[in-house]
């Protein structure tokens, strides 16, 4: 991105999906479930998961200047582990938002703990005039890079790049 290989950036997409709170019988509160308590966690998926997507996006693509978001709490009440009584859930279970970066590119961000089958799916993709870049947490050391080679159309295409500390 810093080298300009993607050209002018048009789109940024990121998601962070999990399924560990989809069970409606899952209680809230206590040491193991502090993320479900707004008094302790501060927020739900927006602060816990989506914050990583936002931080990475700003690092790669610059500041965000506009946002329009929606959140949802799918299970409105859960039994508290300490009291055994039902209490209102005060965190967000899912968040989706559109954003605009200072460079003019548009973004879509999504995070949820209600994506059955996903334990920690975190992906991002950046699309530019000259190429695209995709990354998946499940394959941490690999970038997928599409090079739109203007000089030689025969070399256009996706490439898998192994990345490491070196």
Question: What are these regions, as identified by a protein language model?
Answer:
Residues 23-24, 46, 117-119, 136:
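Alpha-helix N-cap/helix-start motif
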Residues 71, 111-113, 130:
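Short, well-ordered turn and helix-capping elements at secondary-structure junctions
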């Amino acid at each position: 991105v810093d080298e300009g290989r993607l050209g002018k950036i048009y789109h940024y997409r990121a998601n962070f999906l999990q399924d560990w709170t989809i069970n409606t019988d899952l209680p809230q509160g206590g040491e193991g479930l502090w993320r479900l308590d707004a008094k302790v966690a501060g927020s739900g998926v927006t602060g816990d998961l989506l914050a990583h997507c936002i931080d990475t996006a700003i690092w790669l693509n610059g500041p965000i200047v506009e946002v329009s978001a929606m959140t949802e709490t799918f299970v409105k009440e859960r039994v508290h582990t300490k009291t055994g009584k039902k209490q209102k859930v005060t965190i967000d279970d899912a968040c989706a938002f559109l954003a605009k970066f200072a460079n003019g590119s548009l973004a879509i961000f999504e995070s949820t703990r209600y994506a059955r089958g996903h334990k920690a799916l975190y992906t991002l993709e950046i699309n530019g005039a000259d190429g695209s870049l995709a990354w998946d947490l499940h394959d941490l050391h690999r970038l997928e890079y599409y090079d739109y080679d203007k000089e030689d159309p025969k070399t256009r295409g996706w490439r898998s790049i192994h990345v490491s500390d070196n």
